[in-house]
Design a protein with these regions (language model features):
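Structural detector for short beta-strands of small beta-barrel domains
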Residues: 2-17, 53, 625-629
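Short aromatic-glycine-enriched beta-strand elements
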Residues: 16-27, 634-640
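Accessory alpha-helical DNA-binding modules that contact the DNA backbone or grooves
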Residues: 22-30, 35-36, 44-54, 59-273, ...
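Pre-P-loop entry segment of helicase/translocase ATPase cores
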Residues: 152, 221-222, 266-326
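Conserved RecA-like ASCE P-loop NTPase motor core of nucleic-acid helicases/translocases
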Residues: 337-379, 449, 512-517, 534-555
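Conserved helicase motor core of SF1/SF2 NTP-dependent helicases
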Residues: 353, 357-363, 372-379, 390-398, ...
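Conserved helicase motor core of P-loop NTPases
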Residues: 452-618
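C-terminal accessory regions
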Residues: 614-617, 622-739
């Protein structure tokens, strides 16, 4: 991009986003008006600026100047000074007062304000107090202007520069030059990598103490994104050495200091030193304690429970098998129960019977699941209202950033109910489990339901698996495939996959198909035909309801390539559809998209077709999908309708948290259910291409599974029971609590 420079004064501001500073304004340049767009720090009408950027042609609004950076210039002639002071930029000065000030001090006005502010009292209508207030405002604007220039010379964009200035004010000079790594802790949007680049520019040594400490914490943060709550010391050191380019002894020398600063916790287990980020250690430890506190027993005679079960069976015309009946009994007798089982094993019937039992006892029951889709499905199968765990806990938007959850319901304001049933527990990570348990008081029954053979949560921890593996709590495993489920080859084959048994690929099934193709492009062509022509009629659904699931993000059959191809096929470019390009991805009106990061501060609304708001709240979560309804370049937002009809005005600045969702990774699909799924399949890394992944993909389909690809890879995945190691200590914490 060839940068151009324009100089002029701000005639008027058309639009300004107070949250991120995005502004559309009219700049008068050589007596001609020019529309400028960009992020402006605290700019006001009447100000003189020198702007750097490029001319662009907007499809709707015509010629614009897209500003990359700018500097405010003090007005040089008396007319410009008067225009600036009277513009409203300085609170308390109107047009008449501005004229009197300039008439008195002429071109010397700004020097007087900055160096001899008390002299402003010479002007009629200005007291000594008001004179100092005016000077303070002018000086604050000068400080901000100088800070912006200072930060931009280090490559910091204007949006981030405003955040940094708002956090540190005049301290930014010392922070940036002495320890820029503070920013990674203090400011959302500044991670270790950004701070490290800034540190290199200002000459911070690569082996400085605060760089190594910050690097260690960054490695633990990245490990959490991979699902780990801790790393063994040897592994942490290896990763930190690779990241920082220093010696292992230099890394190890900082562990004790970080522990003393309460940034990390070091735990010795079986001769291995486990190193936790402080937060995750205490989440695991307190989760174990709270689980044990809920694990109480209730003395209810078997004969009484069995009589109630028979009564419910008679009314519902459903008969429980012995494991289901045992689950109901355990739910009545225990404060904490885990129910696990694969598809078609009667989890829903069991949950419904438990609900009806407690309902007959006059007890209040809350139902919840980790995602909106899972909660909706729970509502449909039980006939009772189910909410997301976040909504049940009354998410309040969290702390200072978009990625930290805060809930109204906690130990000081617990959930007021007798029974809580959580479905799809395999998706619950340690952070959400900790928040849930804080809001559950002793005496409340907690029933955790899930399929332990599904992939673990996207977030850190292996909560369901660790709870079961601890052996500390009552657990009922449902194994029988019921008659109505046994007619579905999706369910039958899912269990065969889970057990490592051979699956027939003769395509004689009514809901499970394998189309053999061995070339990526041929696989893609078949996938397109299935989505556009075959499957919508076969499963009575729209093409948007059919989901492509793939093991990987990269590669010929990865999410990134498939989404570009599927978008062009399903939602091609059209003059009537507005678009927004972001880092190589085109987002278009009508696109299917997915949120890829928890954001607890995005506001949403549910409205009727007449525009009446019937519900509103906060939070869009990792894995939530939606459709882009409208793109507004002027406001720099797009309207997205997410699951459950939640409409969001999604700002462009958050587009790094959004991606196309015509194809998604199997891991991201966890907890969702689709009428039909298409799984393109070729060989890949052994640790990824395993039984667990294939089982999860197949169980996402309600009516039809179609796998397109190499049958050898399919069979190898069934036989490959290896899984990537996930470092999680909840099981050990629970065992310690029971000793």
């Amino acid at each position: 991009m060839e940068t151009e420079t324009v100089t002029g004064y701000v005639d008027h501001i058309i639009y300004r986003n107070a949250e991120n500073g995005y502004t559309v304004l009219v700049l008068v340049v050589n007596e001609e008006e020019l529309t400028c767009v960009g992020t402006f720090s605290d700019i006001a009408e009447g100000e003189n600026i020198e702007a750097h950027g490029e001319y662009t042609e907007h499809a709707t609004y015509g010629r614009q100047f897209k500003v990359v950076s700018f500097e405010e210039k003090e007005p040089e002639d008396e007319m410009a000074i008067e225009r600036y002071l009277g513009s409203g930029a300085i609170h308390g000065i109107g047009l008449a007062l501005a004229a009197r000030i300039v008439r008195r001090f002429k071109k010397d006005t700004f020097r007087i304000i900055e160096e001899e502010p008390e002299r402003l009292a010479e002007v009629k209508g200005i007291s000594q107090r008001k004179a100092m207030e005016i000077a303070d405002q002018v000086n604050a604007k000068r400080d901000l202007r100088e800070a912006m220039i200072f930060l931009q010379q280090y490559g910091i964009n204007m949006n981030l520069a405003v955040k940094i200035y708002n956090k540190y004010g005049g301290e930014i000079y010392s922070v940036l030059k002495e320890n820029p790594y503070r920013m990674a802790d203090d400011i959302d949007g500044v991670g270790f990598k950004t701070a490290d680049e800034l540190a290199a520019r200002v000459g911070i040594k690569t082996d400085s103490d605060f760089r190594i400490k910050s690097g260690i914490q960054y490695v633990l943060q990245q490990a959490a994104m991979d699902g780990h709550t801790y790393l063994p010391m040897e592994e942490l050191t290896r990763r930190a050495v690779y990241l920082l380019g220093v010696e292992s002894s230099q890394v190890e020398a900082h562990y004790m200091n970080l522990a003393m600063d309460r940034k990390i916790v070091m735990q010795l287990k079986d001769d291995i030193t486990q190193i936790y980020a402080n937060t995750f250690y205490y989440m695991e430890a307190n989760t174990a304690v709270m689980l044990k506190q809920l694990d109480v027993t209730y003395d209810v005679p078997d004969i009484e429970i069995e009589a109630a079960i028979r009564n419910i069976e008679k009314k519902t015309e459903m008969e429980l098998d012995e494991h289901q009946a045992e689950a109901v009994k355990e739910a009545v007798r225990n404060g904490l129960l885990v129910i696990t089982g694969g598809p078609g094993t009667g989890k829903t019937t069991t949950i419904n019977t438990i609900i009806k039992y407690f309902e007959l006892e006059g007890m209040d029951i809350f139902l919840a699941a980790p995602t909106g889709r899972a909660a909706k499905r729970m509502s449909e199968t039980t006939g009772y209202e189910a909410r997301t765990i976040h909504r049940m806990l009354e998410l309040n938007g969290g702390m200072d950033t978009g990625s930290t959850a805060g809930f109204e319901r906690n130990e000081r304001n617990p959930l007021e109910t007798d029974v809580i049933i959580i479905d799809e527990m395999s998706m619950v990570d340690i952070s959400l489990m900790y928040s849930l348990l804080k809001a559950v008081v002793a005496g409340t029954r907690l029933i955790l339901v899930g399929d332990v053979n599904q992939l673990p949560s996207v977030g850190p921890g292996s909560v369901l698996k660790d709870i079961i593996d601890s052996g500390a709590f009552h657990t009922v495993k449902l194994t029988k495939i019921f008659r109505q489920a046994s007619t579905s080859d999706i369910i039958v084959n899912a269990h065969k996959i889970n057990n490592g048994e051979e699956v027939s690929l003769d395509n004689k099934s009514m809901d499970f198909f394998f189309l053999k193709r061995y070339d990526a492009d041929k696989i893609i062509n078949v996938t397109l035909q299935l989505i556009k022509q075959k499957l919508p009629k076969f499963v009575n659904a729209t093409e948007y309801d059919i989901q492509v699931l793939t093991p990987m993000r990269k590669g010929l059959l990865g999410v990134e390539r498939l989404n570009g191809i599927l978008q062009a096929y399903m939602n091609p470019a059209d003059k009537s559809k507005r678009e927004k390009e972001y880092r190589g991805t085109i987002f278009r009106e009508g696109d299917k998209v997915m949120q890829i990061k928890n954001n607890y501060q995005i506001e949403w609304e549910i409205r009727t077709k007449f525009g009446l708001c019937v519900d509103k709240g906060m939070g869009i979560f990792n894995g939530d999908t939606g459709i882009i309804e409208e793109i507004n370049d002027f406001a720099e937002t797009m309207t997205i309708s997410f699951d459950e009809g939640r409409k969001v005005e999604y700002p462009f600045k958050l587009l790094e948290e959004l991606e196309l969702a015509y194809a998604v990774t199997i891991h991201k699909s966890q907890g969702s259910e689709y009428p039909a799924v298409v799984i393109p399949l070729l060989s890949g890394p052994r640790m990824l291409m395993n039984r667990n992944l294939l089982y999860t993909a197949v169980t996402r389909a309600k009516k039809c599974v179609t796998i397109v690809g190499d049958e050898q890879t399919f069979y190898e995945m069934i036989q490959n029971n290896s899984q990537q190691r996930r470092y999680s200590g909840l099981r050990d914490r629970i065992v310690e609590e029971t000793i």
